[in-house]
Every structure is written in structure tokens, then in C-alpha cells.
Amino acid sequence: MLFCGAKGPRAPGSRSPHAAMKRGVLRSVVHIDSCAMKRSAFALIWALAICAQSETRANEAVVTAAPPPWDAQSRSVVDARQRTFQSGALTLSGTLYVPKIEGRIPAVIVLHAASSPTRDNPLYWHLVEMLPPLGIAVFVFDRRGSGESGGNLEDSDYAMLADDGISALRMLQRDHRIDPRRIGFWGLSQGGWLSLLAISRNAQAAFAISISAPMVTPDVQMNFAVANILRIKGFSQAEVDQAVATRTAVDDFQRGRRDRASAQSILDAATTKPWFVHTYLEKTFKDPDRSGWAREMRHDPMATLHAVRQPTLIIYGSADPWVPVQASLERLRASSARHPNVEVAVIAGADHAMATSVSPADQVDAALSARQAPQSAAYFGLLGAWLEKQRLARVR
């Protein structure tokens, strides 16, 4: 497993990854973990893809590199068509973007962040703009129960959502313009979990890209996020501790570690507190056998990763209030010997959506989450570098 840390210039408010990728000289602070990694050709492609991020730092250096040795043609002609496909009994709908170039090309299937269920969400625009000029098709579909797709999200689980992505892969394999051996998944947040899950469940998938998806279980992630939300909103540490204790009591009931009466008593006492509205808790809870959350919180992304053999890129933002990045890195490092196919990067200054100019208050505002989109030049560059390394991107 290769760990990389990337730090690049900001592109405030920019939705153009091409402009970000083609900026001038880039400077990166490099931390190299001599215990777990070595320099590779990946580190030499661009300054934005330099090894590595680690708790143990053997040395530090500032590296200056020339601009990227290629130019993505942002005016490429792209064929955009609506496509429907079957996933079990459901009909799902999306849009396929295919650059008009010769030969069969790779494709990326976008899997959904929890709060971004439809194909037109700004979170996915950069892929539609960035990848076709690099010779990569992009398929973005409406999640089941959203947009023009059938089904009901409440009746689904992570495995079903991952299987929707696999069904999309099978549909693309029948497209004469797509190389059936070079189709993979991209996902952010929950979509990152789904990308890993989908590729672990289908050996024909070629690669996975997981952005801002923690390597801890969902209950651990949500406790971390709620604690940060309350701190950002100005609550005291004592109030933060009370909120996390309340969430933990409910989760313990769902895991069979606490009886319903005591969990409900703790929850009842919390409902009158000013911080309760920020805890993502209801005023009561279902029995574990009827609770979707009880199923979700048992998902261990590390167990999924252990089943992945294909090339995988995992990226985090160092300023992400939703994800315990450090805890995720520690789990990844602990099993790095098992995952030579996995590369891990941390983008300095990037948040959960790979943006760099969004205030902490706006980052945790649920009403604004559907509007957030990547703007980090380092993220765009790192993504392009990895795709080029995998011989998926056509560059010159």
C-alpha cells in the first residue's frame, strides 16, 4: 500500500478541473514513511502525486516540479445519452458521457454520496467535465428511489446499492464503444464505501476510486462527525460528550449491548437539549431487526477492502469534519502489507467534498451539502495522475 500526501494551489470557486490541472509550477510538502513505502513512478508523474503521508516521518522535503507533461483537450466532442438498465426487478436511469474518439475506451461509474442521489448533483460535474477529454467515459445515474430511477431507498442496503453499480457495469460492457475490461467505480463518502463494495463483489470491475470514505464503521464515523458539528456550532466539550454518549447508548441497544429501557431513558433526557437537533437522532428508535441503521452500522469497510484485488485509489481531505481521517489512516497502515494494490493520498486543506474554500460552518450545514463540489487543484491533479498511471487516461 502506497501512502501519498498532496498539497497544491487552491482554485477558489472554480468548477474547472482542466484549469486546475494545467496551472504552473506546483509545490508539495512531502512526508516519507520509510517503514511502509518507497518512491514509485507515480511520485514522478506530477508534483501533485508525491509520497507520502504518515505518522512516522523519516524526513521532509519541499519538491518543485514542472507543469504536467500533457494537455487535456477540454473541447473534446462528447456524446451524452440517457441510458436505462435493470438491477434486479428495478429500472434505473442515468446519463452516459462518451468522448467521440477512436477505439474502445475505459469508463467510470459514479456511485452516490448519501446526500447526492441524482445524476445532476454538482458533486459529479467535475467528472463529466474532466474525464471525457482524457478519453474516459462517465456514467452517472439516479440512485434507486431518486430522480428517474425506480425503487425505494428505505428498502435497500449497502450491498443492494453496490449491486446497482455492478448492474450498470454489465450494461456498459455491452456498449461497443466501451472496453469491457476497463470499467471501474468512483464514489465519494458513502459512495466510496459502495465503490469498494462493488469491486469486491465483481471480479470483472477494473478499478475503484474512493473519496472521503472512512475506514471505520458508520457508528464511529457519525460520533466523530457529530462531535465536530457541535464544536463548530459553539457547544462546550461537556455538551459534545453528552451528545456522543447519547448516540452511543442508542447504538449499543442496536448492537445488543444495552436494554431498550435504559437507552430510551438516555435518549429522552437528551431530546430537550439544544444540541439534540444536530445529533442525527430521532426521539425513538426501532428494534434492531427493523432498523436500517442497525444494518448499516455493522458495515466494516476494512473487511471489504481485504476482498479487493484490483487497483484502488483512496483519497482523504485533511480538513474533513465528517471523517476521522487519522483513524482511517491508522487502520490502513496496520494492514498495508495486505494491500499492494491500494494507494492512499491525503489532500492538504481539502474538506469532505474536496473543496478548499468552504467555511467549517457551511461544511456541516446539511442544507448546503447538495451544492458542494470539488475545487481542489491537488485533487484534480492526483486523480488524473492515477488514471494515467493505470493507463486509463489518454494524455499527450
Where are these regions (language model features)?
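Alpha/beta-hydrolase active-site loop
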Residues: S156-D175
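The serine-hydrolase catalytic nucleophile loop
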Residues: P117-L127, R143
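Short beta-strand/loop motif that positions the catalytic acidic residue
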Residues: V308, I314-Y316
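Short beta-strand element of the alpha/beta-hydrolase
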Residues: R104-A113
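Conserved alpha/beta-hydrolase
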Residues: L131-E148
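N-terminal cap/lid segment of alpha/beta-hydrolase-fold proteins
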Residues: V63-I101
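Accessory cap/linker subdomain of secreted extracellular hydrolases
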Residues: I209-T304
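Primarily recognizes the serine-hydrolase "nucleophile elbow" in alpha/beta-hydrolase
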Residues: M171-F235
